[in-house]
Amino acid sequence: MKVIDLIRNSKSTAFSFEILPPLKGNSIQKVYNVIDKLKEFDPKYINITSHHSEFVYKTLPDGSFQKVNIRKRPGSVAIASAIQNKYGIPAVPHIICKGFTKDETEYALIDLNFLGVNNLLILRGDIKTLEASQQNPELYHDHATDSQ
């Protein structure tokens, strides 16, 4: 069901919550443990935040540094699908247009459609930390409305 319809048709205040994907190396079970504790409150939907990659500096064997682009957390696509399939609660993954290239955004939307995740929250994302989108603006959407 579409979250907008759940909100529109609700006779009382609806409860929802937001999940921060676990750091890489953790399993989906960490997310399930949180949801298991909160599902008694009958959430109408669950938001899944999304975090863009960030640059870190890796020390090379010769003592020099290399700038590396890494993601510390899994994306919201897989987590949204896992939550929706396990619990039957609509999932709302966040898609940040400044954190992903236009192609990455398109692929995420194709995957979400394929997985039956129909609710999205599309955001611009933080500008100050997104060096890549500033260096290659033609590859990124400037605003969420550009994703349409």
Where are these regions (language model features)?
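N-terminal amphipathic alpha-helix/helix-capping segment at the start of soluble metabolic enzymes
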Residues: 1-17, 84
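Glycine-rich, proline-tolerant flexible connector loops at the mouths of alpha/beta enzymes
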Residues: 22, 44-74, 127-139
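Alpha-helix-loop-beta-strand connector modules within alpha/beta enzyme cores
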Residues: 9, 60-93, 141-148
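Glycine-rich anion/phosphate-binding loops
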Residues: 26-32, 97-114
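Hydrophobic faces of well-ordered beta-strands that scaffold small-molecule active sites
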Residues: 13-21, 44-48, 91-95, 120-122
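Catalytic domains of carbohydrate-active enzymes, especially glycoside hydrolases
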Residues: 33-49
